Amino acid sequence: MLTTLARASAMLLGARGFASAADLDKKVEMTNWEKGNYINYKKMAENLDIVRARLNRPLTFAEKILYSHLDDPHGQEIERGKSYLKLRPDRVACQDATAQMAILQFMSAGMPSVATPATVHCDHLIEAQLGGDKDLARANEINKEVYDFLSTSCAKYNIGFWKPGSGIIHQILLENYCFPGGLMIGTDSHTPNGGGLGMAAIGVGGADAVDVMAGLPWELKAPNVIGVKLTGQMSGWTAPKDIILKVAGILTVKGGTGAIIEYHGDGVNSLSCTGMGTICNMGAEIGATTSVFPFNDRMYDYLKATKRQSIGDFSRVYAEGLRPDENAQYDQLIEINLSELEPHINGPFTPDLATPISKFKEAVKENNWPSELKVGLIGSCTNSSYEDMSRAASIARDALNHGIKAKSLFTVTPGSEQIRATIERDGQLKTLEEFGGVILANACGPCIGQWDRKDVKKNEANSIISSYNRNFTGRNDANPATHAFVTSPDLVVALTIAGTLNFNPLTDKLKDKDGNEFMLAPPTGEGLPANGYDPGRDTYQAPPADRASISVAVSPSSDRLQILEPFKAWDGKDAKGIPILIKCEGKTTTDHISMAGPWLKYRGHLDNISNNLLIGAVNAENGERNSVKNFETGEYDSVPATARAYKARGIPWVVIGDWNYGEGSSREHAALQPRHLGGMAIITRSFARIHETNLKKQGMLPLTFADPADYDRIPPTAMVDLMCTELAVGKPMTLRVHPKDGASFDVKLSHTFNESQIEWFKNGSALNTMAKKAQ
């Protein structure tokens, strides 16, 4: 009898009696798409019993997932916020923009097959121009070289491959691969979407994915756990999205850093599984490691609807391991009464500027935001479920019944081929098209900047509103003057009808085709399709049985794919008299460090994509973007050109950064590029978690000012000495600053390196360290 499961009661989900070792010793496959990969609740329960005996305290659900996946539950040091956990994830998932570099790195490891189940999803390289099928056909043509590389490499290395048009990675994962209590890493920052099915799904850089695909344990600093207790029940215009919009306003873009957000309380049971996914998805915007919901009936219903009832039944047996213990302690607790929660709109330019709808009109006026709404966009990995589309269609139908349509431009991005086919069958797609919607491909599209926007000129101030998750400057359309707001699909549709930000559907009236006033009815929609899901077109490629004869060709003349050369090892010396490439002022996201949009096509070619290094960052010296002074010539040039000039002369350099440097996407290119162009260290007030790890993996030094105020003391034109020989666990490092005018001074720097990560730096990268051990 397993003690963890012996505590199980009949309280949850119809579970009856107690679970024994025999109850958990079953072969239930993780997914319908693979054979021989099983959910190992028995091993997870055994690991939890070992950890419980050691810690002797109640555990949060997040802790249960992590500790049940420990590589060494007997010997692992466990202290929230301090220890580095070595974990064994159940799965790895990559999207096509990050998969290229991950697979190129995996190839260099020389292994015949991935050691952990993995999938690749083609969703990032499809640009929104004319509409779904035409855009997909164009993407297949211009990205053929990359898709062929991914298809053949996946076949070669035993990786499941989801073709272009299949849908957005996170929707596909929720529909097919996520399971309660599992641990998955994904090379996309919105991987936490899987928390909607009770899975700890964590965004990582490609180098982390390579480690796990190669069979190594994955390292994660033991997160703190922030509890969000939900009470009451939502109604009317309030949607699940409003919960995370509210939480983002409370915690801000860095308030969740180093923590898992764990939702609990009676209010959880009123949310759909996909609604919970929405909330977890956007937890990435507050810096959270991931977000989770405990297993409940809504998750079971979703598993059943997606033809995975056997997983739901197995989860009911393991129910005790899929919820927090009574009296579990949280490092911070937030309470939200859903009965009182208002719809929210967040933005512009940052996802944590939260405004309830009742105050939004006033905020528009006070801040002089452009009130005319140019475009409304629904869909994306955050909000493209059947429930989202049904509720949006109900509002659109209400408008059509009154003889009016969308006043603003309106786009719809289905999250997957399954969603597209199902809403086509059930009529929501037709309603949204009649309303004026342009149906885009089942892909990321405008959410990640894959949008060939024509209705405004560059630098023309305008407003758009979307159901997306991220609204940084220029992210959607490369126009820094676009004021982008994020909200629920419901409010997007409502404001699109009005054509203005100065509309509150809870209080304001519209005019029908005859000039009569009316109010929109609150949205309605089923969480799951009554007639089941329609899978639509077959978009999956399984690895073949015979993989030995498959060859993965990369042309040496390709401008999109490039075989990687190992980075040089550290020379063992302090770096003296080196320049500051740029002192970044204000928000510096991974979009600023390595832009997406038109640059996505170079994600498999490190040298070419390095031509966008930090071109979006603001130079504190002159307030300009992509204009820095070469200390040798005294001339101003672009950031990449200046970095290349230093590299050609064998001169390493550093970057000075502000708060939460590297927030946003998980793209490891933002760490690979500075390393490739000769960078040695990034020194900031603070880092976003994924980017800090990515820099370490590539052999760079992510360092923080021991006193954040020292950021202001560093002249952008100063030369510096970096005492690399001081690098040791838990010890500060010294930065000696030599201003052009004035005396030199020392600044103390902090870091989070452990012993194994220091080896990455010494060897030149984590991949070099892996190769060295394999020799």
From Swiss-Prot:
Q: Which residues bind substrate?
A: 95, 188-190, 470, 475, 603, 666-667
Q: What is its EC number?
A: 4.2.1.3
Q: Name one GO molecular function term.
A: 4 iron, 4 sulfur cluster binding
Q: Which cofactor does it need?
A: [4Fe-4S] cluster
Q: What does this protein do?
A: Catalyzes the isomerization of citrate to isocitrate via cis-aconitate.
Family of this protein: Belongs to the aconitase/IPM isomerase family.
Protein's name in the database = Aconitate hydratase, mitochondrial
